[in-house]
């Protein structure tokens, strides 16, 4: 059996909370066209991401990448921000 690695997902969003130590909450929005009503719908989701240096604050735009589980809810890591 061969070990084939899947590419890790990369998402972009905005930090909405940085109160926890080494953790930020990132809100990721996506738009898609509804298949029946043909209207664009905006959907958002929140992810807990690991920020090892505590350098991102609320309002920062960041990119997060999927990683191994760090805790019960954290499976994403902040890779860079603006």
UniProtKB/Swiss-Prot annotation:
Annotated keywords: Ribonucleoprotein, Ribosomal protein, RNA-binding, rRNA-binding
GO cellular component: cytosolic small ribosomal subunit
SUPFAM superfamilies per record: Nucleic acid-binding proteins
Record keyword RNA-binding present: yes
Keyword rRNA-binding recorded: yes
A GO biological process held by the record: translation
PROSITE patterns noted in UniProt: RIBOSOMAL_S17
Alphabetized GO MF terms: rRNA binding; structural constituent of ribosome
InterPro entries with a match to the protein in the record: NA-bd_OB-fold, Ribosomal_uS17, Ribosomal_uS17_bact/chlr, Ribosomal_uS17_CS
Gene3D superfamilies recorded: Nucleic acid-binding proteins (2.40.50.140)
The protein's assembly and partners: Part of the 30S ribosomal subunit.
Entries under NCBIfam families matching the protein: PRK05610.1 (NF004123), uS17_bact (TIGR03635)
Function, in words: One of the primary rRNA binding proteins, it binds specifically to the 5'-end of 16S ribosomal RNA.
Family: Belongs to the universal ribosomal protein uS17 family.
Protein name: Small ribosomal subunit protein uS17
Native source species: Rickettsia rickettsii (strain Iowa)
């Amino acid at each position: 059996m061969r070990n084939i690695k899947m590419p890790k997902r990369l998402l972009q969003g905005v930090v909405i909370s940085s109160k926890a130590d080494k953790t930020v909450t990132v809100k990721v929005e996506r738009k898609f066209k509804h298949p029946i009503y043909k209207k664009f719908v905006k959907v958002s989701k929140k992810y807990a991401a690991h920020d090892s240096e505590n350098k991102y604050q609320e309002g920062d735009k960041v990119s997060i990448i999927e990683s191994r589980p760090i805790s019960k809810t954290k499976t994403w890591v902040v890779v860079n921000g603006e």
